[in-house]
């Protein structure tokens, strides 16, 4: 008598990672996935697109949406679009992870919280950067105070940078996944194209190597991404800034800063794509691109 074959039940769900700018959302996503797919920087506003990260472990698949930081300030078109992207990510998910920076609660955190009051999904409060809290006695009163603001599913202190308590956060995520088929193959870590990831890597290096010199009026357009006859990726990246002075900052003395940005970006791409990369970078002034919705659409900031 032949035994009846039974398929193992699988679980899948969508998780939104939200919070004000620069609280460690991208670092958290990268730590969960075990590799970098979302750019990180000490500066705010480094995440401008919703990045989908996919973490599959056995029968569990969690699909993460890493949002731009929510802002009170909406004067510029790009900030309005970033807020729109972050808010829409909250809409149709199974769990929301609300990330805050230690015990530093401010008006932006309050604004995010107010948006979460309307959310249908349960909310986990992840208190990040707890390794930076010098006086640990501050943590318990903060948790007591913040727990009065919303009925959180869980409140969990973490360090995304060091990986502290991330395993327990993942356990909480798994309890929120629904029975159902996996949406992606088990070896997928993102649904973003290599072209998109190349532009994000270049933008991260711009953020890192221009220090506080360059404001957020900079973006990257990939003009060419192809595999040549020798099996090498040929990538041409156009860096757009708003003023001539910013162009000089990016290029640096005798082109050294641009060369450093290019070298670091190429090395990251080769690690991510597991392939040799030939990278060419140019810098161009395009005044007012961050206030022009047509330009933002062509650069991929607005979904068609």
Curated annotation (Swiss-Prot):
The protein here is known as GTPase Era
Pfam families from the entry? KH_2, MMR_HSR1
**Which NCBIfam families does the entry mention?**
era, PRK00089.1, small_GTP
G1: annotated span: 19-26
Q: Which HAMAP family match?
A: GTPase_Era
Question: What organism does the record attribute this protein to?
Answer: Histophilus somni (strain 2336)
Q: Where is this region: G3?
A: 66-69
Q: Where is this region: G4?
A: 128-131
Q: Identify the stretch(es) annotated as G2.
A: 45-49
- Domain spans labelled Era-type G: 11-186
Cited InterPro entries = G_ERA_dom, GTP-bd, GTPase_Era-like, KH_dom-like_a/b, KH_dom_type_2, KH_sf_prok-type, P-loop_NTPase, Small_GTP-bd
């Amino acid at each position: 008598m032949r035994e009846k074959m039974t398929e193992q039940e699988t679980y899948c769900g969508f998780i939104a990672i939200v919070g004000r700018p620069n609280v460690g959302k991208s670092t958290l996503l990268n730590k969960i996935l075990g590799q970098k797919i979302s750019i990180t920087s000490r500066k705010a506003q480094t995440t401008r697109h919703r990045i989908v990260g996919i973490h599959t472990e056995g029968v569990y698949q969690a699909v993460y949406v890493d949002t731009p930081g929510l802002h009170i300030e909406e004067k510029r078109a790009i900030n309005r679009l970033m807020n729109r992207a972050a808010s829409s990510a909250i809409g149709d998910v199974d769990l929301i992870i609300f990330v805050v920076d230690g015990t530093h609660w401010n008006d932006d955190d309050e604004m995010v919280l107010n948006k979460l009051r309307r959310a249908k999904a349960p909310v986990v409060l992840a208190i990040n950067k707890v390794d930076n809290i010098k006086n640990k006695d501050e943590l318990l009163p903060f948790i007591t105070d913040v727990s009065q603001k919303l009925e959180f599913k869980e409140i969990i202190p973490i360090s995304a940078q060091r990986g502290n308590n991330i395993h327990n956060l993942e356990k909480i995520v798994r309890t929120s996944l629904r029975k159902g088929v996996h949406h992606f193959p088990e070896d997928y870590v993102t649904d973003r194209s290599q072209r998109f990831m190349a532009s994000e890597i270049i933008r991260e290096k711009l953020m890192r190597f221009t220090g506080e010199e360059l404001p957020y009026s900079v973006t990257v357009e990939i003009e060419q991404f192809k595999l040549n006859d020798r099996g090498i990726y040929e990538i041409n990246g156009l860096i757009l800034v708003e003023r001539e002075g910013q162009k000089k900052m990016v290029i640096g003395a005798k082109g050294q800063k641009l060369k450093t940005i290019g070298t670091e970006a190429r090395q990251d791409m080769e690690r991510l794509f597991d392939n040799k990369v030939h990278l060419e970078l140019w810098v161009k002034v395009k005044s007012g691109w961050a206030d022009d919705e047509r330009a933002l659409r062509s650069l991929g900031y607005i979904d068609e």
